[in-house]
């Protein structure tokens, strides 16, 4: 029997034999494609090739692509685990032609692979084509020899593919496998008439032969292309003669492992089976998402990951798993697939810790949320209502972190619907509140005016890699509100665009340059430089003298010292990332950065706070590279070549086909290689020195290092020396003896504190004895009330403990005031609990002090904000006892 690895390798090897370039799977995070949350098909990494925006050094390609479909129109989440073939994560096998071969070859390749390489019987194969695609029909019948009765013509919905409203599109042809009558859904079962599993689509061949214009007209492409996709999970199930994808060697090891740790059996109870299948599916998705740099969060891709972890955890709870377990099943995925996808192995330890932490956090809120949901559903049941209100669903989402699909799952099992319309309304209101509070709302208005300039063909040429000064013509002037103007008068601020500039605009985490822009009629201070688009650089200026006019020639001079400081920090950011990966592990990925003249800030994926030893080692290694005075070199090359060379790139960052590669070190000693458009030093020695000033956590699994370089380190060290000298003077010692002196003082202080505690304990004991002299008797009950001013709550408790040890029966109410705060303790001995309990009594007497409290039957505590009400509180207690 063919294993999954056999089939994957057979597919790739088959097409390599026909001159296809094997291309590694791209990340689940689509590069340069803001329209997609995740890579959901094999063609995604080739989209720009198909649209003609990019060229590659090959015309044929084959891939096994990691894909994820959770959300949007490709949302399989609700069906996962309930059907034989729905998954969140899956692998798409594909072969592609970029203007090389077309329909005939694509069909021949597919048919030969299925019937000869996989040995699937032709009698079980059926074909669908687009209704007007006579070419495909002719190839299937006359070249391949498929009987016409096995070919079905389908409409545009089923057999015509398009990339969007415009762009490449074309008919497609699907190969279906007949799984037999046992899968039949009834009398109307058949291709195109039902959605059951009998006639299972296994391979889709897309013939990109048209371009759809904005008018809706379709014109023939000069170089038609091929895009095919075959789901690995489906073809494995067929080859292994399994009725469900979950019964194959892709899923069974995970399912059986999960069943063993949960103490349950697969294929005994349907609900248990669903839970096991969901956990197996989600474990695969979770592992690959984290391996590709996605971390749990409350938005975007991170929120999808969080949903999957929480959903799988809840299904685990249904089969008796009350402790974290997903981190174990995720490791099983690594064990199964790490040899093929090595990124799983390199991040396995990090992955386990992220998942474990997320499970622990969710388990804390899950029980509370489930109790609330259960109570709400029971209340609705009593009212004979079958819909959970949207505000309750939103509270579960907002307060307890319950995704809507989890709420729907639980509600539907109890035959309740959820008012999703009101839920979405409340969600939208929350988003609008967030938008209205966002401080950058003015920025959007400015961006709109820059967009207008771009649409008018406005461009700026950046000459700042080689030059810190230059001349350019002023091609646009905007006032501070972004409105176009003819002149910018003295003392005013605005935006200046020149046709060429040495000023670097904010991008890639690097802040914009500052400097001087002047003309024959005026002078400005450039306080910032923006880069709203690839070819547009905008100078933010304040006119210091004269007037700046549109269409003038301007002299632009970048502040050399500020640029150099920024370059120091940027180069050290590259060195830092490389060092972090060497010391902490390959799981370290950049999660954000800021490079300015004064400091660098680097966010990276790592689960635990750095130890002092790790921080010291990182600092030492970065400074070692600085002192080695390694050269920096900049090269331009195509993106694919750069990545193959080992250059690090941010998946969220937008890169062109030709990229700028910054390499630190020589051929024999490379410290770092990254895609980067920023400004850098020419050698590492120019950085001078590197000091980490802080290391903090900013999100689950994300740490932040802030550091300084160059002359900023000198200022930092000088300030430290000054503080150390001042501290030494106060302590009357030498700077090098400060630690020794402070240690001695702390030790002395500790001994003194012990003496104070002993004296205070004795004093409090005496205080207790003294208070017992003031006992009064009400209705045969010994009662003590006392206001002890300026005692801490701890001291009050110690006095109460002393009194309790000496009073066998009675009621004691002690109070203390600290400013406007009131502390209240109430004790009721056990023999009086048939009439009074401390927890009930305290609630009746705290109103005068504007307080609230509670506790146990024997002792309760309250806090208040009205010290003047204490006498009334004591009087209230006495009245209650007298009335009993």
From Swiss-Prot:
InterPro entries: aa-tRNA-synth_II/BPL/LPL, Ala-tRNA-lgiase_IIc, Ala-tRNA-ligase_IIc_anticod-bd, Ala-tRNA-synth_IIc_core, Ala-tRNA-synth_IIc_N, Ala-tRNA_ligase, Ala_tRNA_ligase_euk/bac, DHHA1_dom. GO terms for cellular component: cytosol. GO terms for biological process: alanyl-tRNA aminoacylation; negative regulation of DNA-templated transcription. This is Alanine--tRNA ligase. The gene is alaS. It is found in: Cytoplasm. Its EC number is 6.1.1.7. It comes from the Bacteria. The keyword Lipoprotein does not apply. Keywords: Aminoacyl-tRNA synthetase, ATP-binding, Cytoplasm, Ligase, Metal-binding, Nucleotide-binding, Protein biosynthesis, RNA-binding, tRNA-binding, Zinc. Its main location: cytoplasm. SMART domains: tRNA_SAD. It catalyses: tRNA(Ala) + L-alanine + ATP = L-alanyl-tRNA(Ala) + AMP + diphosphate. PANTHER family: ALANINE--TRNA LIGASE, CYTOPLASMIC (PTHR11777:SF9), ALANYL-TRNA SYNTHETASE (PTHR11777). The keyword RNA-binding applies. Belongs to the class-II aminoacyl-tRNA synthetase family. Its cofactor is Zn(2+). Zn(2+) binds at residues 570, 574, 676, 680. Binds 1 zinc ion per subunit. Catalyzes the attachment of alanine to tRNA(Ala) in a two-step reaction: alanine is first activated by ATP to form Ala-AMP and then transferred to the acceptor end of tRNA(Ala). Also edits incorrectly charged Ser-tRNA(Ala) and Gly-tRNA(Ala) via its editing domain. Pfam families: DHHA1, tRNA-synt_2c, tRNA_SAD. One of its GO terms (molecular function) is aminoacyl-tRNA deacylase activity. Consists of three domains; the N-terminal catalytic domain, the editing domain and the C-terminal C-Ala domain. The editing domain removes incorrectly charged amino acids, while the C-Ala domain, along with tRNA(Ala), serves as a bridge to cooperatively bring together the editing and aminoacylation centers thus stimulating deacylation of misacylated tRNAs.
